[in-house]
Amino acid sequence: MSWSILEFLRKNPEELKNNLKRRAIDVSLVDKAVELDKKWRQVLQEVERLRHQHNVLSSQIPKLSGEERKKKIEESKNLLKILEDKEKELEKIEVERDRLLSSLPNLVADDVPNGPDDSYNIPIKFWGKFKVYEGDVEEFLRQTKDANVNYEIIKWKPKGHAEMLEDVLHLGNTLKAAEIAGSRFYYLFNDIVWLDFALLLFAIDYITQQGYTLVLPPYMLRGEVIQSVIDLDTFKDAIYKIENEDLYLIATAEHSIAAMFFKEEIEKDKLPLKFAGISPAFRKEAGAANKDLKGIFRVHQFHKVEQFIFSTPEDSWKYHAELITNAESIFQQLELPYRIVNIASGDLGACAAKKFDLEVWMPAQAKFREMVSCSNCTDWQAFRMKIRYVDRKNNKRGYVHTLNSTAIASTRTITAILENYQREDGVVEVPKVLRKYLEIFPKAPKDYIYPLKNKII
């Protein structure tokens, strides 16, 4: 086992403890892992000594005869039994140690802000022209302090996306969906459905033009696999499990794509491998409590296009920058104003060494909301899934690095369009970049989405 965290455990456990402190996690986990690894190495020495003794004994037996031969054969059998018991003990300790190591989060990158929660996240970039209601200017300036941002003041108060969707456009119904399925479900109709499809087509069109292979992945994964992709103990309240089946619904195509090379080796000269996955995403949102109960911002199901890269360790930071650049290009083409946030250590999640969020300005809410999450997971997932690269020229093996980023999460992006592209009369302009994906369908909206006079249901 050659994961970097084991090397840290042996050479610099204090640095590993500091990593856990940065994440606001109990450092005693490191002490337990150190003790298990120490015990493992002690038992390994005993196993190797016993193997050597058994090999020496086995080599002597063919040269012997009579009672001495019988005596040595019996001695060999007894020694083999002791060896087998020690090997079982070694395996048991190794499993326990590796289970504990697998529960530890990734090593935080040096340039990640320190802090226990999202209040320590640091905005590092702003893009676009922000529409700000005159009553929200002070709050907007507070959220963009020390940044040179371009904004326009509007005198009318934009309506929230939930009100636009259900009460103005009459193109959605969450109340009926809640009646038959529970909260955080929805019915969407006509132009909003077309908008959903257009966003997905635009995202996969753009990302595949950047050299990514399009993937339609499995929507479910076995328990062993999903546990390797994410920290399932932490996220068990976020992932749906199929009753009486060892299957879990994916929360993003990242999960299935990450597992594409489960327990396999990849030739180093084939890296990087870049994929664009399109799939539904299923999320319990159990930890969301009473957040975003109205509308379609935080829901149990939505469509998503995901970027994913398998990389060599030396190139992974380059590809992390590429992923967020791709995401920025998508939202720039949509002309949705946003900021990029460097996520604090305590808000990262176990998988990521570093994460950027892209947050779009929502003028009705007077706040920035997350649309994209872009992570470098280094070798955390690869270690757990046993995905290695093979460098045959240098006779070397190592764990690949895995990286992921949202391209489009459809419902969230629709909320951003409804708030940023609405007019005072309730009409919503269709972003120009999406229009070519709609023009081929006679019933799809072309330039504008107009309010219906009556509700569909």
UniProtKB/Swiss-Prot annotation:
Catalytic activity reported: tRNA(Ser) + L-serine + ATP = L-seryl-tRNA(Ser) + AMP + diphosphate + H(+); tRNA(Sec) + L-serine + ATP = L-seryl-tRNA(Sec) + AMP + diphosphate + H(+)
GO biological process per UniProt: selenocysteine biosynthetic process; seryl-tRNA aminoacylation
Keyword Nucleotide-binding: yes
Binding site for ATP: 283-285, 299, 370-373
Binding site for L-serine: 252-254, 306, 406
Purpose of the protein: Catalyzes the attachment of serine to tRNA(Ser). Is also able to aminoacylate tRNA(Sec) with serine, to form the misacylated tRNA L-seryl-tRNA(Sec), which will be further converted into selenocysteinyl-tRNA(Sec).
UniProt note: domains: Consists of two distinct domains, a catalytic core and a N-terminal extension that is involved in tRNA binding.
Name of this protein: Serine--tRNA ligase
